[in-house]
């Protein structure tokens, strides 16, 4: 499903881990941005006709044979171009400058000496000042292309910021998109709004209207099936579709018995009572848990759950009959093409819950969120009037509690884990911490320890608690709970949940760990 955007910033991705952050920063200004891999950048330029282009960073070196380049048409289109890190080096190499391996690498915090006034620095940095930026480079520019001048230097980069003001070409060795460059967002805003002259009129209200019109045009009078999990992505998808096509939509909520406490009741109440959406609730807990009983391999757990989900969803869809479209809550990061210096770009489109269903059932896909990041989806949810408790709900994995129960899965262990998890989240909400934490949950370890309760000896499970802060889930830090909170929560779990006699707290960040345990 495509929606049109008149003023777009095109971001050419050379494989940087923070390319998505550039797009999100631009969107936060109220300007639409789109990412394309360097291999298909020329097609993106012809299709999108952008008002400005940003060249991303990269793990590659311009000195390597076959390293990525931008289409030369980028520099011939007569539009503003901003190069960031590797993007700066690519711009210089392609326009006649020179890049060499640096004698002094710069990683982390650095200071930029502002040498000249520039439209990029207007109202942000003054000539002669020293400004904190974030660097991550080994190579550096050593000779400028014709028409360029130096506007900023650093200890390890004599051409840390350069510009050709006549052609509106700007390039920086540092990363303005990361929070560690305190004024980076203002610099990007100067480039997008002042230099490129793009109006910041992209909003969720406008996107909502465009998406509804696009859904109606694509779907017509046909029926649509939507898999509902209760998470923010599927919830926003369902409400947006219902606003567009009303009773043509049927939602299916498959309860696999591995969800959080009271989650099924909360989902049913919201969508049946508040939105009057036709919703089929399938209680398939016995089927899933029986199939998982005794399974210890985390990958087999995921595959078993995925296979059964497809079987249940397929069976329920056949009962409805006549549906031509399957709706998915696919987000923009799921469809952005990954970048490889050699070979074709690879597009990741499958969704862990319904992957393979459209082909098996001869249905067409409708993906109204495929142009949005997670924070865009939350904004759209507010625009649609979804309750905050659903919009701010912590991420929850498709396989549910099965992957928070390392070792063999049993019905008893899932119930123990569900109760412990509910207590932990209850204490987090009481302490006013829920919205400060990206994700929090309990894990039931496949370990039993000796304990003493009353006059008796116990031999019961260990419960681990996990809480992390994050912006996008790509990296995460553990949340520093105070000892009073942990002591209070541990006491409740041990006293109220039969089967647990010890509680520990996970203080691993990502990397090196992952957020989930399996």
From Swiss-Prot:
Keywords: ATP-binding, Glutamine amidotransferase, GMP biosynthesis, Ligase, Nucleotide-binding, Purine biosynthesis. InterPro entries: Class_I_gatase-like, GATASE, GMP_synth_C, GMP_synth_GATase, GMP_synthase, GMPS_ATP_PPase_dom, NAD/GMP_synthase, Rossmann-like_a/b/a_fold. Homodimer. It comes from Bartonella bacilliformis (strain ATCC 35685 / KC583 / Herrer 020/F12,63). Pathway: Purine metabolism; GMP biosynthesis; GMP from XMP (L-Gln route): step 1/1. GO terms for cellular component: cytosol. ATP binds at residues 229-235. Its EC number is 6.3.5.2. This is GMP synthase [glutamine-hydrolyzing]. Signal peptide: none annotated.
